[in-house]
Every structure is written in C-alpha cells, then in structure tokens.
A protein has these predicted regions:
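Signature of WW domains and closely related Tyr/Trp-rich beta-sheet microdomains
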Residues: 14-17
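Structured beta-strand-rich core segments of catalytic domains in phosphoester-bond hydrolases
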Residues: 35-116
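Sequence-level motif detector for i,i+2 pairs with an aromatic at +2
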Residues: 1-3, 69
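Short, flexible loop segments at the rims of nucleotide/cofactor-binding pockets, characterized by
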Residues: 6-12, 85-86
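Active-site beta-strand/loop signature of hydrolases that rely on acidic residues for catalysis
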Residues: 3-8, 19-42, 97, 109, ...
Length: 117
C-alpha cells in the first residue's frame, strides 16, 4: 500500500496538471493533500484523482471561504469520516477517516492555516 501526503501550496493553482502527473508517477493508493481548497483548480485536481482511481474522497473545507486552505483525502477504498471526541476548534485544519482497505485502518491528516486574529 502506498500513502502520499503532499502540501500542494495554495490549492495547486496552475500546477494542478503537474501535481496530478506526479501523483500518477507515484501510483498511490491513498493521497492526503493539505492546502487543498474549494476553488476550481483544487476541484479539478479532485476530479483528476477520481478519474485515476482515487474516487473515494473526504474533504475538510470551508464552503463560505472558497480560498481558505483545507484538506482532501482521496482513496482507492471507501472512506468513512470519524468524529473525534475532542475535536479541534478549526475543522478545516484536520481530517480523520477510516479507510476500508484490505487491512482497514484510520488516517489522520492535519494542515490548513491558523486563524489570524
């Protein structure tokens, strides 16, 4: 099993095709992307991952702020969101999922950006 974690920097922007090509070269079974966003480039990347077999996806995004950094986990196997008992106060900065792989496991991803006050 190959798991890749990658900070794609600012939602990927114009680099999403290069990011998708590099992920193709690595041939991961699961990808955890930080600084993923609800913007068109990031959404295009999610679609590209789905077309490459990473169709099971869970994201931690702020729909009210499309350009806010969040997280995406994409997998070849079904994902189940896990609700933590003591969740961080910033939900776009973490994502916890169960992976229904041949040997099931839990994956936690952290990323995003801190709230500025």
């Amino acid at each position: 099993m190959r798991v890749v974690g990658w900070n794609i920097r600012a939602g990927g922007g114009r680099r999403v095709e290069l990011i998708a090509a590099q992920l193709d070269a690595w041939a991961p079974d699961i990808v955890a992307l930080s600084e993923f966003r609800a913007t068109p480039p990031s959404q295009h990347l999610a679609e590209a991952l789905a077309a490459r077999g990473l169709a099971f996806q869970q994201a931690a995004l702020d729909p009210g702020q499309l350009s806010r950094n969040g997280l995406l986990v994409a997998s070849r196997w079904p994902l189940k969101p896990i609700r933590a008992r003591s969740a961080p106060s910033e939900p776009c900065r973490w994502l916890l999922v169960g992976v229904d792989a041949p040997a099931p496991f839990t994956l936690g991803a952290r990323g995003g950006e801190a709230t500025r006050e």
